[in-house]
Regions:
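N-terminal secretory signal peptides that target proteins for export/translocation
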Residues: 1-3
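Eukaryotic scaffold repeat domains enriched in small/polar residues
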Residues: 5-171
Length: 171
């Protein structure tokens, strides 16, 4: 009888232990990703400090954007290696922004109230909260499906959210 109880309880305990190891952030991205090794993670973090601002910076040409389910609009722009992300509410009022220095292209995607910044040159996805903290990093795998996702979603000029269509246009 004791042996049966152990055989029954052991799988349950194993499931509980495994479920506790699941990352609490678990970035939701359309890419297939992997964990960065310690060296790549430290290298990326040392060269890509993200600063938060509550003052609306000067506007530059829009390079990317995304719209959250709650109606927040994140707009990315760049000038001479300096990148900026501006976050606006559904009425167009500036909420906060990020500034960082990265010598390559990037894309944006909302993940709940957090923002995923996709760094093209380094193949890194960084999950950033509204306070400018990097919560999680992932390496974007080099696959055909990921190449398609870059073009069809991340760099798309149009987004539809909650029945509204948002389009990025150059004048």
């Amino acid at each position: 009888m004791k042996r049966r109880r152990v055989i029954f309880i052991l799988p349950i305990i194993s499931l509980i232990v495994l479920s506790l190891n699941i990352c609490s952030f678990a970035m939701n991205t359309g890419f297939s990703t992997s964990e960065p090794d310690e060296k790549k993670q430290q290298y990326f973090l040392s060269g890509n400090a993200i600063s938060l601002t509550y003052e609306e910076p000067k506007k530059y040409i829009i390079s990317c954007f995304d719209v959250s389910e709650s109606g927040l609009v994140a707009v990315g722009s760049a000038t001479y290696g300096n990148q900026y992300i501006y976050v606006y509410d559904a009425t167009g009022k500036f909420q906060y922004g990020y500034a960082f220095n990265n010598p390559g292209s990037y894309g944006l995607q909302w993940d709940g109230s957090d923002l995923i910044i996709y760094f093209v040159r380094s193949d890194i996805a960084a999950l950033v909260d509204s306070a400018g903290n990097i919560k999680e990093l992932k390496v974007i795998d080099d696959t055909e499906a990921n190449n398609s996702y870059w073009n069809k979603y991340v760099f798309a000029k149009e987004r539809t959210q909650n029945g509204n269509t948002y389009t990025m246009k150059s004048n």
